[in-house]
């Protein structure tokens, strides 16, 4: 009798495992590879510490190579007409070129190209590529600069991150929003790893933490990156607050202690000293948003890149290959943004510009769209 009960219990467990794990391995929202889907499933079932240890061990023994040349055409060379504004619509000045870390500079490195949908004929989005530092010269990262005089920001919420809902804005991007969409990009960590809160559209999904790095979207579509202060409140002017860890950049310089192995401050997943795919978001002194994303980055590299791109305050967003994605769209002037006219900031980014238009996409993300006049 005991043996039969044991066999039955094992069969029930195996059936559950096949259903649960099998469903996860078939779910594209958990990652592009079977390995990443298994890792997300394991984290959701109490094995976060094992997954984190395994990933740390892997990446610690597979650091990016030192030196070396870039693949052919890895650096985007801007066209001669990329920064010409054709109207007098109020907009920010074209950003100054980024001074590369590695010398000599490669032609086009750090120089901006206007891309994507224009706003009343004026470029609202500029992108560039450069090597992340003077040592790992076979890698390239992407930088996007967004003119928030021309663009409006929005936080889309997911059933996986932050969970809960329903939300007024969630994947897929609808036709009404696709008509003005310029770019979409990843947000932050899973909420149980973000060490911060989540507020959107009058709903406090996760309580906000004082001191946390916060991406704040206001009712007029402008956005900011700040440390959430003890006297700050969610007023009627605030639409969304997405927190993730602590500020990486403050007062236009990297914050102190970035090399400290503090998994609470900089995130338990992969730690802070491992070179992996990372992304970050900052705000410039004149209100533009800057996004940085790419491979082979540690937390210090990411902060240095954000400062070099002009950020006065900045925060880390999501990390790891499957989650770092920035896509921009170039439809006809009155057309809808979509996969067919989308392009990624870096060709090596996992996923495609279609992910934000898929109903299965379950993580939160950020969009910038042409501002209504």
Question: Each predicted region: which residue ranges?
Answer:
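Glycine-centered loop/turn motif at secondary-structure junctions
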Residues: 46, 310, 342-344
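Aspartyl protease catalytic domain
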Residues: 147-150, 155-308
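Short, solvent-exposed loop/turn segments at the edges of secondary structure
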Residues: 139, 210, 276, 359-363
């Amino acid at each position: 009798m005991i043996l039969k009960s044991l066999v039955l219990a094992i069969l029930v467990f195996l059936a559950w495992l096949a259903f649960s794990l099998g469903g996860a391995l078939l779910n594209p929202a958990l990652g592009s590879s079977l390995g990443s889907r298994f890792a997300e499933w394991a984290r959701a079932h109490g094995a976060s510490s094992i997954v984190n240890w395994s990933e740390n061990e892997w990446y610690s023994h597979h650091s990016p190579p030192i030196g070396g040349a870039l693949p052919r055409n890895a650096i985007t060379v801007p066209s001669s007409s990329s920064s010409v504004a054709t109207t007098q619509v109020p907009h920010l000045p074209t950003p100054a070129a980024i001074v590369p870390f590695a010398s000599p500079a490669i032609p086009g490195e750090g120089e901006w190209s206007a891309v994507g949908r224009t706003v009343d004929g004026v470029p609202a989005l500029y992108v560039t590529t450069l090597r992340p530092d003077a040592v790992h010269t076979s890698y390239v990262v992407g930088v996007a600069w967004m003119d928030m005089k021309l663009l409006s920001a929005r936080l889309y919420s997911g059933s996986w991150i932050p969970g809960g809902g329903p939300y007024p804005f969630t994947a897929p991007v609808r036709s009404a929003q696709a008509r003005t969409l310029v770019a979409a990009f990843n947000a932050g960590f899973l909420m149980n790893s973000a060490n911060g809160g989540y507020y959107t559209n009058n709903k406090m999904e996760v309580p906000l933490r004082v001191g946390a790095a916060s991406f704040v979207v206001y009712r007029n579509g402008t956005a900011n990156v700040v440390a959430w202060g003890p006297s700050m409140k969610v007023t009627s002017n605030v639409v969304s607050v997405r927190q993730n860890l602590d500020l990486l950049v403050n007062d236009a310089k990297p914050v102190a202690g970035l090399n400290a192995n503090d998994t609470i401050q900089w995130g338990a997943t992969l730690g802070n000293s491992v070179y992996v795919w990372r992304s970050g978001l900052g705000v410039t002194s004149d209100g533009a948003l800057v996004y940085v994303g790419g491979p082979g980055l540690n937390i210090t590299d990411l902060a240095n890149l954000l400062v070099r791109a002009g950020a006065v305050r900045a925060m880390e967003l999501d990390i790891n290959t499957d989650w770092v994605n920035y896509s921009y769209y170039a439809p006809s002037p009155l057309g809808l943004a979509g996969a067919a006219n989308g392009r990624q900031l870096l060709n090596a980014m996992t996923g495609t510009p279609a992910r934000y238009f898929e109903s299965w996409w379950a993580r939160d993300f950020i969009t910038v769209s042409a501002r209504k006049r």
